[in-house]
Amino acid sequence: MAGNANSVDEEVTRILGGIYLGGIRPIIDHRPLGAEFNITHILSVIKFQVIPEYLIRKGYTLKNIPIDDDDVTDVLQYFDETNRFIDQCLFPNEVEYSPRLVDFKKKPQRGAVFAHCQAGLSRSVTFIVAYLMYRYGLSLSMAMHAVKRKKPSVEPNENFMEQLHLFEKMGGDFVDFDNPAYKQWKLKQSIKLDPSGSELVSNSGMFKDSESSQDLDKLTEAEKSKVTAVRCKKCRTKLALSTSFIAHDPPSKESSEGHFIKRAANSHRIIDIQESQANCSHFFIEPLKWMQPELQGKQELEGKFSCPGCSSKVGGYNWKGSRCSCGKWVIPAIHLQTSKVDQFPLQSTALPNMVNFESEKVNR
């Protein structure tokens, strides 16, 4: 087995088995990681101007994830790739790696990998934690504890921790890029980079069909039975499926977000406090193709959505975010108003008068 389990090294920390963590110093100093720890693979989570030549010369197997330690980088997009890289180091030549099909918890590791970033405190830690969740089925808190007990100073930034929480909600094994929470997070991150939303909506590929067969094809029959359709209350044009909804959890009544506070004009004086409503007044939703003319054409920070069938107001958007009647802030906010639409089970036979806007356009 790689390394000496009892050795203490400030630059290279053994986390579990053949998994080692550290900063850039061992790379700069050309430490013989192979001779010292039997390390054969190096995961560099850092932006190199040039990959250090000695790493190649010494025959290490390299994986470079060129990212910064910031509040906007999407690290989730790399988890499947880096987990596979670490797998192939620790458990070489396996026929199957999926943790859904095979259990390696009692399987001896046969390799050693060194994951590093600049300081070994945030970026590289994030990928090791993701691997421990993926391979050993650990919760996020357990995986963080497994790293912190060996290196207490580690502290992934808030952005990376938020994504690790998302990964945990996805099941902690593979990244689900169609997960509504992930899509909402991507929207929120894009607004951080461009508060106007113009860069986001300039990509026509981000607009989704109002009735996406791709979403439905991924569902089991039991899940399909729970899908609902939303239609304009006035003309019955189908506007969306519930598979496009972006879920939000109403805040607790005890929290400040769970109350609406009214202040006097030009003053901080509170003149009224009301509790948030139990029922939500909005369906927050992904950008849909029928919204494209409004979002791409006008490029405003906020606006209204009109039904493509009858032009009645059915919703709105605000790139800075808006507040649901339940009190929850959603950023960015793209929504349909529950008072302007009807919601029915998709598989219900009680929808004889529903108009499918997309098919109507084709037939005209």
UniProtKB/Swiss-Prot annotation:
The record's listing under CDD domains reads: DSP_fungal_YVH1 (cd14518)
**Which sequence positions carry the modification called Phosphoserine?**
S196
Q: Name one Pfam family in it.
A: DSPc
Q: Does the keyword Phosphoprotein apply?
A: yes
* Catalytic residue positions: C117
Protein induction: By nitrogen starvation.
SMART domains reported for this sequence? DSPc
Specify the domain of life of the species encoding this protein.
Answer: Eukaryota
Q: Which InterPro entries match?
A: Dual-sp_phosphatase_cat-dom (IPR000340), DUSP12 (IPR016278), Prot-tyrosine_phosphatase-like (IPR029021), Tyr_Pase_dom (IPR000387), TYR_PHOSPHATASE_DUAL_dom (IPR020422)
Q: Which reaction does it catalyse?
A: O-phospho-L-tyrosyl-[protein] + H2O = L-tyrosyl-[protein] + phosphate
UniProt keyword annotations, A-Z: Hydrolase, Phosphoprotein, Protein phosphatase, Stress response
Gene Ontology biological process terms in this record: ascospore wall assembly; autophagy; cellular response to nitrogen starvation; meiotic cell cycle; positive regulation of autophagosome assembly; ribosomal large subunit assembly; ribosomal large subunit export from nucleus
Gene Ontology, cellular component aspect: cytoplasm; cytoplasmic stress granule; nucleus
Q: What is its EC number?
A: 3.1.3.48
The GO terms this record gives for MF are: preribosome binding; protein tyrosine phosphatase activity; protein tyrosine/serine/threonine phosphatase activity
- Residue ranges of every copy of the Tyrosine-protein phosphatase domain listed in the record: 11-173
> Could you share any additional remarks the record makes about this protein?
Present with 7570 molecules/cell in log phase SD medium.
What family name appears in the similarity comment?
Belongs to the protein-tyrosine phosphatase family. Non-receptor class dual specificity subfamily.
Q: Which PANTHER family match?
A: DUAL SPECIFICITY PROTEIN PHOSPHATASE 12, DUAL SPECIFICITY PROTEIN PHOSPHATASE 12 FAMILY MEMBER
User: In UniProt terms, what function does this protein have?
Assistant: May be directly involved in signal transduction and/or cell cycle regulation. It is necessary for maintaining growth rate or spore germination. Could show both activity toward tyrosine-protein phosphate as well as with serine-protein phosphate.
Protein name as catalogued:
Tyrosine-protein phosphatase YVH1
